[in-house]
Regions:
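Cation-handling catalytic/transport regions enriched in His/Asp/Glu
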Residues: 1-173
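Conserved small/polar residues in nucleotide/adenosyl-binding loops
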Residues: 174-180
């Protein structure tokens, strides 16, 4: 926050960015993140189920499986003419077969790693430098010499958690017994 407020100035007058505009920018950053996250989860779950060997999916059409998933991952039910799978090339021709979830998982790891810097207090240069050194000595230095999970655990001191991503997206953990859908 302080960094942006110190450098953001009007190009003609030199007036600093007002606090209320900073708040608007922050709110805009997370606008529709819930819908975007549902969309990515829809893609990832569809990919995993279509590439699954589970018997519960045997004999079902791919589109039927996707529409069942849509019951919990979309706000608006897909129309009958929706042939989304015909153009979802990532999972059929793009090398992501059963791997589309890695997009969202990368966001989880990134947010969780960044939260360690936040926990060190971004305004505390000494703590941020120490955390940066730890990042350099683990994630950047070890690279592929260990499994990614082991490298992450060495940096973070624990397994990855989704809490930081949920927070950074401006979402909260709430329980809804039944999905709310627009039909």
């Amino acid at each position: 926050k302080n960094t942006l407020l110190n450098i953001a100035k009007h190009w003609e007058t030199g007036e600093k960015l007002p606090e209320e505009d900073y708040i608007k920018l922050c709110k805009n950053r997370t606008f529709n993140c819930g819908i975007a996250t549902l969309r990515q989860l829809h893609f990832a779950i569809t990919d995993l189920r279509l590439h699954s060997n589970k018997s519960e999916y045997k004999g079902k059409e791919a589109d039927q499986i996707r529409r069942e998933i849509a019951q919990n991952t979309t706000v608006i039910e897909p129309i009958d003419e929706d042939k989304f799978l015909c153009c979802f090339s990532h999972i059929f021709a793009g090398g992501y077969s059963a791997g589309y979830y890695s997009y969202k998982w990368a966001e989880v790891l990134s947010a969780d790693a960044f939260s360690m810097f936040e926990e060190a207090n971004l305004e505390n240069t000494k703590n941020v430098k120490a955390t940066g050194k730890r990042f350099k000595d683990t994630v950047l230095s070890l690279g592929g010499s260990l499994s990614p999970l082991e490298v992450f655990k060495l940096f973070r001191g624990r397994e990855p958690k989704t809490d930081s991503l949920i927070k950074h997206l401006g979402l909260s953990l709430i329980h809804i017994s039944e999905p709310t859908r627009l039909r």
